Swiss-Prot record:
Record gene name: Gr59b
Cytoplasmic topological domain residue ranges: 1-4, 84-97, 299-309, 425-518
Protein name: Putative gustatory receptor 59b
Phylogenetic lineage: Eukaryota, Metazoa, Ecdysozoa, Arthropoda, Hexapoda
Subcellular location: Cell membrane
The keyword Membrane appears for this protein: yes
Organism: Drosophila erecta
GO cellular component: plasma membrane
Segments passing through the bilayer: 5-25, 63-83, 98-118, 278-298, 310-330, 404-424, 519-539
Amino acid sequence: MPSYMAFTPYIMFSTNYAAIAYILISRCYRDSMLLDLQRITLEVNREMLRTGKKMNSLIRRMFFLKTFTLTYSCLSYILAVLVYQWRAQNWSNLFNGLLVNISLTILVVTTFFYFVSLMHVARGFDFVNQQLEDIVSSQSMDLKKKAHELRSLWALHSNLSNTARRINKHYGPQMLALRFDYFIFSVINCCIGTIYSNSDQESSFEKFFGSLLYWARSVDFFLNDYICNLVTEYQSQPKFFAPEGSMTNELSSYLIYESSTRLDLLVCGLYPVNKAKWLEMVASIVVHSIMLFQFHLVMRGGYTTLFSRTYALLANIITLTMLPIVMWQVRSVFLAKRHYPQLILITNDIRYTVSFLIILYTLLSRGFRDTALKEMQPLLLTLFREEKRCGYKGIDGVRRSLRILLFVKFFTLSWLCITDIIFLFYSSDAVIWVNIARFLFLSNTNNILEMVPMGYFLALWHIARGFDCVNRRLDQIVKSKSTRDQKELQHLWFLHTCLTKTALNINKIYAPQMLATRFDHFVIGVIQAYWGAVFTFDLSTSFLWVVYGSVQYHVRSLDYYLIDYMCDVAVEYHDSARHSWSEKECY
């Protein structure tokens, strides 16, 4: 794994731990719900045995496929430890690896229980539909017996609907946590898998094993969404087989009940679980994986291979060609939603025009920024070497105020990127290729506007970190009596000079980009402030959307303010006053 991506396992394992902790804590609620499921499953089995009905072939194939993906994933986790840790012949590492990977199987096994629970519910709904069709088309059954069978099916259908809602309610927070865990797993492994697939250090067997495990987990999680979609479909399946001549009061009442009872399986009330949302999540995974891969290409030192140069060229051409078309389609969808005041439409056009121009300049000027990042690398190596020699090791050796600045900036950046993705995720009405392409392009381009200023911030943050290291070490040298410490003044002088030159060069290269970004932030800030007032007071808007827009506006303002504040911090550390020095210490 590249050294600059060493933090990704911490993110992935932290997410895994949070999901596993919630699964284990909430187990008692699921166990009580599974007891109710067992009773209704026995009832469905008894009715199917009485009538001679069998399980639907589609449900049976899904169950076999889910069992295969579960078995393969669990065995792969355990066998991977036995194969790779056995070579080292270290029992401590073998035990730790087994403990970790057996814990990871909890994430897969728990979704299997969710799948099996909904599979039994879908099987019950399918039996109700088959039995209802037989009752309606039967000529030998009298009306009294038909009425009795209809009442039994009605009661079974109602129990199945209530059980499905209970399953969704108890498993909702857990499936939300597991969905986030799978999202992080997919983004990180997709990016790292792409990097390793072009590497010669790993064998073909390891690449094949990793890709097969990745796709097995993807299919395994897809089946969870598909079974939810199947339950909803079977619960309200159209009854075209009921002719008007065979309609009775009981049958009419049942059909009215079934058509008016809709089963919406929402995860924590946030979004429906179906194939449509699955495809949108896959599109989001692709967007974030591309963003991580772009970060990898930049951090490895620019376009050094034909593959990376071709990728960057094609990505820029496709983005600049398709983005105006996508923005025009978004404008059409925006107009079709509801009737807006004319000034809202004008400001919306201004906002998209400015954003496109900024993105155009950002992509065209990428080579200059890559040059600045290349010049930062030797300086960073020198800075890390000096920090290690002075006793300031790693991130813990950095001043606390600088660490807080970095963490807050990462939080605002992550918030803006993730919330923009979620907003676009929920704004799609139907899953068609146009909406998926629109989602991909808008997600990627919105991230461009947020990620490019982050490079400027990180460069200034490292420069401020270097100036602070020089200042702290200089205070120690001045107060020291050792001649060895006093000889370090030349090293500090050289480091201070390099930091100053690099800061001036980065500011020169990034100046047009930051001027364009400032104009973009100014336009978006003015327009969103106006929109916030209009949507809050003049138009009927949900309270949650008002809160979301307000928080988004203030987080965006804080995100940009941190860039200006970082410039002030770098200048302050460069010109740090030496009031603590006495005249005797100056020589």
